[in-house]
């Protein structure tokens, strides 16, 4: 187990999460007693208690007052916020995880972008107008792409779509930083934003779903072509 945390709390958190992931503390079992676990990890009980509370909020654990702390099946109890952690823990599954992420984006974006163009075309146009000022480099496009999808999600009138994108931000933008290093990706994105802007102007909301799905297909093809050179630290946080 290689842990890169910089603080005792960070070390304890990574230790427990990796132990759950590697079945040292399997789902459905109980954690060792607080005193034993703090000695095992090498942190104070106060620090451990804070870490356990945080992991419980994220769905990894269930703290039962007066009873031992239970390890959850995190796939059933956690939210989108653990995607980055899962990607870091299981490098071999990262390509499939990202494929699933992009598929989800296309499927829900087809719905909320259509709603934005139909119900709030002026707001959608304002979001898409940002694309006319973007610098032709990876970080700029990465930020723009996230802001456009998130902005259109909120412009749909259903804030739940926006909250979903908030939850996806970490992994989404790390993948995007690599994806938009390809000039073809940036060119395709600009064409997509321009088509959406035209559909907004023409109020042709009935064509939005096909537009989004075609973009998902074309961008997915570019992504597949880039997987062979995907950096091993793609899902690691910048330090």
UniProtKB/Swiss-Prot annotation:
The keyword DNA damage does not apply. CDD domains: WHTH_GntR (cd07377). SUPFAM superfamilies: GntR ligand-binding domain-like (SSF48008), Winged helix' DNA-binding domain (SSF46785). Residues 6-74 form the HTH gntR-type domain. It is found in: Cytoplasm. InterPro entries: FA-response_TF_FadR (IPR014178), FadR_C (IPR028374), TF_FadR/GntR_C (IPR008920), Tscrpt_reg_HTH_GntR (IPR000524), WH-like_DNA-bd_sf (IPR036388), WH_DNA-bd_sf (IPR036390). GO terms for cellular component: cytoplasm. One of its GO terms (biological process) is regulation of fatty acid metabolic process. The keyword tRNA processing does not apply. GO terms for molecular function: DNA binding; DNA-binding transcription factor activity; fatty-acyl-CoA binding. Residues 34-53 bind DNA. Keywords: Activator, Cytoplasm, DNA-binding, Fatty acid metabolism, Lipid metabolism, Repressor, Transcription, Transcription regulation. Homodimer. HAMAP family: HTH_FadR (MF_00696). NCBIfam families: fadR_gamma, PRK04984.1. Multifunctional regulator of fatty acid metabolism. This is Fatty acid metabolism regulator protein. It comes from Serratia proteamaculans (strain 568). The gene is fadR.
């Amino acid at each position: 187990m290689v842990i890169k945390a910089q603080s005792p709390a960070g070390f304890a958190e990574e230790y427990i999460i990796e132990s759950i992931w590697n079945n040292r503390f399997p789902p459905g079992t109980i954690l060792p007693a607080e005193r034993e676990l703090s000695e095992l990890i090498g942190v104070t009980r106060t620090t451990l208690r804070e870490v356990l509370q945080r992991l419980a909020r994220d769905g990894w654990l269930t703290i039962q007052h007066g009873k031992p702390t239970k390890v959850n099946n995190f796939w059933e109890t956690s939210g989108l916020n653990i995607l980055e952690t899962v990607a870091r823990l299981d490098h071999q599954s990262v390509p499939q995880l990202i494929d699933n992420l992009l598929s989800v984006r296309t499927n829900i974006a087809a719905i909320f972008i259509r709603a934005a163009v139909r119900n709030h075309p002026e707001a959608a146009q304002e979001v898409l107008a940002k694309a006319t000022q973007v610098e032709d480099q990876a970080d700029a496009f990465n930020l723009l792409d996230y802001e456009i999808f998130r902005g259109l999600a909120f412009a749909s009138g259903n804030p739940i779509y926006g909250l979903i994108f908030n939850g996806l931000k970490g992994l989404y933008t790390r993948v995007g930083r690599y994806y938009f290093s390809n000039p073809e990706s940036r060119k395709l994105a600009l064409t997509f934003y321009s088509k959406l802007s035209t559909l907004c102007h023409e109020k042709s909301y009935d064509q939005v779903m096909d537009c989004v799905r075609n973009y998902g297909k074309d961008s997915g093809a570019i992504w597949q072509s880039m997987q062979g050179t995907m950096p091993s630290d793609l899902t690691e946080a910048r330090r």
